[in-house]
Amino acid sequence: MGVLGPKVIKVPSDASDDGSAPYKIVDNKLSPLSDADLVFIDPIGTGYSRAIGCHDSEEFWGVSEDPKIIAEFIRRWINDNKRWNSPRYILGESYGGIRGPLLVSELRSGSITPIEVNGLLLVAPASDYQYLVFHPGNNSPHYGFFPSYAATAYYHGKVETDKSLQEFYEDSKNFSLEVYGPALLKGTRISDEHKKSVMKQYSEFTGLSLRFVEDYDMRVDAYSFMKELLRDEGFSVGRLDSRYKNSDYMAGGQYPDTDVSSEGFMSAYVSAIHTWFGEIGVEMKMLYQSGDNEVYSNWKHPQEWKGNDFGYVNTVPDIARAQRYNKDFKVYVSCGLYDLATPCFTAENFMNDNTVDMSRVVFSEFEAGHMMYNHEPSF
């Protein structure tokens, strides 16, 4: 209902709230349905997918468990529909950046029925948690999120510059890669003079006060940034799309009450999917489960990740492996400049940090958020 189907929901492109029903559902002239089968798979416990028989849904909730059952579904679908010699592409959004590469490996590993995939399309991918999780001692997300902080500050008029957004964003990436990242690596070895210079530039790029940057030792996590950027105006900005802004219950505090961007469009999507299914004759007594806190809280993230007891989940090596053993395997990555969940620069960093053949990777950056297709010009 966002970008691929024959019908799509239209939410405000200018990052304003979607309000209440009725919402606008329109024909999608750009849908690839006339050229390809579109098979959407809801992992067990989401959508209409449920475990049956003697099985419980929770058996399939986990980083390792999830791709196995989905790969089995794909094998059976290909066989039932006699599509063994058709090109195959996998698309994953957000956590799909974990699921997608693992699924490619799982399909390739079938001892009896190995299946090669032609390509992987990643939308706002969360493929390497080292670049996304703000933990003490982990500097990767700090320099990865920084350009999106800068883009957000630019959008909300918190920086002084005559440059275009793209020019300013590129400058922020260069600063992060050449100045800020190395400064973080120095830790306490950095000189006072150098640190003051870096913090001053950090403040100028992000619109945060120098005092705030100093208080955070130039390591501002995403939620603190979301709360602080427009604090003087009484607003917090969104996480999935930082163009959105709204007031919290109290202007004080360290973090926003909620993700204002999620509040800005989720109701429209839920209404649209149920409405469209009804129109095409999908009769189900259960509701389409667009999200489930039980799934989130019980999802198994193994401490032991490929032999590294303390490692972050990282599936980018699965992409590199698929490239090495399949000369036709290609990757497309799309991301939004205003995404504070899985920022563009984090994706650029982890794709360049895991022996991926970048000549077979195409990047697209959009002036939008996590769901860049909500932004009409990006769509």
Residue ranges and their predicted role:
Residues 82-95:
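Alpha/beta-hydrolase fold nucleophile elbow
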Residues 43, 60-80:
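Alpha/beta-hydrolase active-site loop
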Residues 187-335, 340-341:
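Alpha/beta-hydrolase fold catalytic core
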Residues 92-105:
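Glycine-rich nucleophile elbow surrounding the catalytic serine of serine-hydrolase chemistry
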Residues 1-59:
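N-terminal cap/lid subdomain of alpha/beta-hydrolase-fold enzymes
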Residues 104, 108-204:
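A catalytic-pocket lid/entrance helix-loop region that shapes and gates access to the active site
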Residues 115, 330, 355-371:
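Catalytic histidine neighborhood in serine/cysteine hydrolases
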Residues 341, 368-378:
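Catalytic histidine-centered segment of alpha/beta-hydrolase-like enzymes
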